[in-house]
Amino acid sequence: LVVIGVIAALAVLVLLFFRAPKVDHKIKYGRNIVAIVLIWVIGMGAINLGIASGLINKKFGNLRDSYFKYGFAYCFTNSVLNTGIQKPKNYSASSIKKIVDEEESQATEATEKTPNIIFLQLESFFDLNNMTNIKLSDNPVPNFEKIYNEYPSGYLTVPVVGAGTVNTEFEIMTGMNLDDFGSGELPFKTVLTNHTSESICYNLKEYGYKCHAIHNNTATFYGRNKVFSNLGYDTFSSIETMNITEFTPTGWAKDKFLKDEILDTLDLTTEQDFIYAISVQGHGAYSVDDSYESKIKVTGLDDESLTREYEYYADQTREMDKFIGSLVKALKKRKEETILVMYGDHLPSLGITAENLKNKNVYQTQYVIWSNFDNDYYKNKKVKAYQLESRILKPLKMTAGVINNYTQFHRKDSDYKENLKNLAYDMLYGDNYASGEENPYVATDLQLGIHPARLTNIQQVYEDDVIDGFFYGENFNTYSKVYINDEEMETDFIDNNTLMVRDCNIKYGDKVVVCQQDADGVILTQTDEFTYSEDEIKPPNYTPPETKKAKATKKSKKSKKSKKNKEAETTSK
């Protein structure tokens, strides 16, 4: 979009050069150049002075607030020009070798205990009981509070407020500090679109894990369908592969459907599993109309509209909490040892300020480490998002990965952050000195969904000179669309095994596929190509659902038959 905008701006300038009125006096180029230079120097000087004095921030944890505070020109320019990690002054083969040598001296063998590991990232999840300026008619998160108080837990420092989920995601998955990147940058939209990176997935693969991502929102949001391949995931189950039937009043999928997705994924493999589940129910905005009836009442706010937003949000966290309780209950019953790490990705966009929080920090959410087996691996403590992976893996003696290893053993060193920046630069923008000058991470062949759709059979039903096509297979849902000879058909979802295309005259030799595509029509995956032939028959013992037209026709025929019978009876009498 930035490139398109720049091209459009240049095109307009060129057009104006030729079409705009010409001045009738001599232009004083020297004076104008001096003025431009002075404006540039004064402007940059003022910005640098503001940054040095702390009046202007180079980092945008809250993009919306930053644009309001510092203005569009500064924020937009900074976001466009300041991307990636600036090359550290001391970056060299020898400096990286020194860091790597330090970490290798700390490497240990992995323990025999390799539990399933689940990271549950809860969208905008926050315990409203931690606010000092409001009162609630009921506790919206009793399950979370109980687990939080009984298991290792603490505050999680995240890089964003109110939005920017993928930046918390990025730090947790890679172990890299977002402060080292450009202002407001989303690495999911920049470097990770075409570059692999060390991640918790690649690190756990060293111990035999299969790695899965689950998200009850569209796969293309933040480009996850591309990025997750570069982060080492084997499967990615998005809303386009799920059968979600309930949504919030603002249109987000409810989180309770994640439970079965998580359990099914654990059942899928014989290996140990790592699952990164990303919820969406708590997503903003929280504006609802006056007809919304809240279950939890909020008092203490002067603004009626804001109060309604808080009440709506409280209701959503209440439902998310029920999902947490049901998931924990289900995991307790499983024989496989499992660690479940739960946390909010950032505070909700409700205008929350530090002074109204018990912990006085808008960049902190809460996390808890639950497990279904006895262990003493973890203690209550605060942790930064980019150190969470190492906090979970260190007690398990899983030291694979340059960044993971370095954080495990050097996070308290005085030069830790600088060396971490060096390692991240080396891996994403440098010469890969840490890994023998080669990128060791190969992008995975990411499978969309754990149960891909499959087309097995086609049947045509003739009805009143109209031919309806029935397409049979497995794992269909409302995002499944029939394509015939590369042309999308208007598709009706009947059930998980059946799709229907009305008025569809398929000819012998036609090529048919079923595609899973998002709401914008982006094709995410498709079945193997199916060539229609005379041998195709309907599945045994299967009666296709009646269409409304068929039912109406039957009713009409039945009515006519009944009328004829009555006429016959009258005549006989």
Segments predicted by a language model, with ranges:
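Solvent-exposed soluble domains appended to multi-pass membrane proteins
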Residues: 101-112, 122, 127-573
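N-terminal secretory/membrane-targeting segments
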Residues: 1-115, 136-155, 190-194, 198, ...
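Long, solvent-exposed extracytoplasmic domains/loops
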Residues: 117-121
